[in-house]
């Protein structure tokens, strides 16, 4: 009679381990736990019902982690941030409130694809408030930004900065209405100073720069002509903004400017760096701090 071969202990242990893993996986699946990839690319490990993640841990591609509670409408982030609002497939979607623990800022409004997108109100801890549209968590489209120091901007934003047409009003009473690009005054605009003086013309990167501009002082004196680098200047410039010189080494001027005094008397001639060539005129243009 042949003796039965004894089973290899290692094989037995391996088989038992596989069985235990299968049982564990089966129980986990029965209880509704899943490991899935969310629409925003994050990984979710937790309980799901009818394909909807309802409770568990979210691991974002940035390394951030958060705890999801679908029924409580909350996502609590590891860094202390809290989202309260509509949740779809583990992502912020619909209306909600986002509280930022590090800064104390609060956003209340619309969300799409787990980003601040749509219309909403963003309140900064230092007192600034933005009301308007956002896209992918950046100010984009029409909005109103009220600064804690009393300044106010109303107009369009692109990629989180003032770009397009808008109006900026300083707490001092000065105002600018016109074009913006990359948060700076660019293109045609009208700048009204607290004193009542006014500039109408072109801006380049926050500076008065262009032809056919008009600067009117509160005392009714007026300058009609070109500006370069914030100053009255009739010299021509090339495509790089450099002043052009003629063959004789002298600067080349464009059209003559007209300076009208409050008495009605006028001076017609050329200007360089704010001064009339050969004539002394005392009026100075004004400045305000950048928005």
Task: List the model feature ranges, each with a label.
Residues 2-291:
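Glycine/tyrosine- and acidic-biased, solvent-exposed loop/turn segments at the edges of beta-strands
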